[in-house]
Amino acid sequence: MLNTTSVTEFLLLGVTDIQELQPFLFVVFLTIYFISVTGNGAVLMIVISDPRLHSLMYFFLGNLSYLDICYSTVTLPKMLQNFLSTHKAISFLGCISQLHFFHSLGSTESMLFAVMAFDLSVAICKPLRYTVIMNPQLCTQMAITIWVIGFFHALLHSVMTSRLNFCGSNRIHHFLCDIKPLLKLACGNTELNQWLLSTVTGTIAMGPFFLTLLSYFYIITYLFFKTRSCSMLCKALSTCASHFMVVILFYAPVLFTYIHPALESFMDQDRIVAIMYTVVTPVLNPLIYTLRNKEVKGALGRVIRRL
């Protein structure tokens, strides 16, 4: 991985420039990180250890929990360190590594939401054929595919970014190493990087988002025209609504961040909006997708009683 940079480290400006807020924000984000890791860790442990949850639906939920633990850990520990530090530096290699894992896990989660929406649509609309359509082989192949695509998507960006020439300011207008603020610091031609960011990352975000919307539209259409039970309709719509809320909270900020041009006027908005999909969504996922589920709560109760 070659680069012609004269910069050996970057300075992360953080969430806010107001020094008086740093201790308070440290406590807030530390609490969020603890809840995220604990909640997702509990879900992952239950899905692995309880034989009653060894089904395809919980296979995807286990993937989501593992993703969210990793996703939070890529950004939050460094953010917490910087809240209490006066020198908010990150090495060049550390910056590129954070960029790679951030985009690898983020794009994988984006595609996983689409897979989970499709899984839910099959479970609701074709329950008798669910085990035939969503067979273990297909689910394993889908999971491996999205992880591999996410890895190579991030590898493309990390390699291309590492080869840029950084000869001026090393102050990143963000709380993490992301592509857009790094491109603002590059001295050379970044047109190819900008095109890859808009085209490839835009496709990775827009494609799964469209497929997710399509799955939920199909579910709602099916429920209104095929379901005669009001209780079943209300329960299914409640499940879809809560899932869809998490999906919107993830996709909307991502699309806002990576679709609009990299202008100086958007930098402050970008780092605030990024909190939604880097910090908030990983906390909500275990609450919305699993801990509201009766089978998961039952499994959690059995684990607690055994302790």
UniProtKB/Swiss-Prot annotation:
Disulfide bonds join C95-C187. InterPro entries: GPCR_Rhodpsn (IPR000276), GPCR_Rhodpsn_7TM (IPR017452), Olfact_rcpt (IPR000725), Olfactory_GPCR (IPR050516). The keyword Glycoprotein applies. Glycans are attached at N3. Belongs to the G-protein coupled receptor 1 family. Odorant receptor. This is Olfactory receptor 12D2. The lineage of its organism: Eukaryota, Metazoa, Chordata, Craniata, Vertebrata.
